[in-house]
Regions:
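Conserved N-terminal entry element of GNAT/NAT acetyltransferase domains
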Residues: 1-21
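Glycine-rich phosphate/pyrophosphate-binding loop shared by adenosine-nucleotide-utilizing enzymes
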Residues: 12, 68-74, 91
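Helix-loop element at the rim of GNAT/NAT acetyltransferase active sites that forms part
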Residues: 20, 27-41
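A short helix-loop-beta-strand connector motif used in the catalytic cores of GNAT acetyltransferases and
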Residues: 49-62, 92, 150
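Conserved beta-strand in the GNAT
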Residues: 62, 70-79, 97
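Conserved acetyl-CoA-binding loop-helix of GNAT-fold acetyltransferases
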Residues: 98, 104-117
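Conserved GNAT acetyl-CoA-binding A-motif
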Residues: 119-131
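Conserved beta-strand-loop-alpha-helix junction that forms the acyl-donor binding cleft
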Residues: 128-137, 152-156
Length: 156
């Protein structure tokens, strides 16, 4: 599908996640990122309310294609409160994905910009993320630098 660049800003709306976004393909979009089991409407509603109760400490950004009424990009940032750096805060970017049909439209950069701006406005002294080697160049274009090594231990 070809998108007219002139109408792109009118076609795509960037905003915070809404509970109705489950019906606009939000969960299917996450399946393009990682293993994502089926979530009932009730489970989605409960998790949505739980995250919303965190206020500015956990924000999920989405981009909706207004023509298709479909969520085509998403990402989240959660704020870690620390004792170091004068009780500073760190933003952790997670779960960034752009629908395969909408890649190349700079939507990923818009999601990252939204999340980084949110972290900055809430007083974070830095924003960090983990990514695959395949996505390193994208994040460098968004102003991130490689630093140190990620480690993980799975429980499931």
């Amino acid at each position: 599908m070809q998108i007219d660049a002139a109408s792109s800003d009118e076609r795509y709306q960037i905003r915070k996640l809404d509970v109705t976004d489950k019906n606009k393909g939000f969960m299917e979009l996450l399946q393009q990122l990682t293993v994502c089991d089926s979530v009932s409407d009730e489970e989605f509603q409960k998790r949505f309310e739980e995250l919303r109760s965190c206020g500015d400490d956990h924000v999920i950004c989405v981009i909706e294609d207004l023509v298709l009424s479909k969520i085509v990009a998403t990402g989240s940032v959660f704020i870690e409160k620390k004792f170091i750096r004068n009780c500073g805060k760190v933003g952790h970017v997670e779960d960034v994905v752009v629908d395969s049909s909408a890649r190349g439209l700079q939507l990923g950069k818009k999601v990252i910009g939204f999340l980084v701006d949110h972290a900055r406005m809430t007083g974070c002294y830095k924003v960090i993320l983990d990514c695959s080697a395949d996505n390193k160049a994208f994040y460098e274009k968004c102003g991130f630098k490689e630093k140190e090594i990620q480690m993980v231990k799975y429980f499931i």
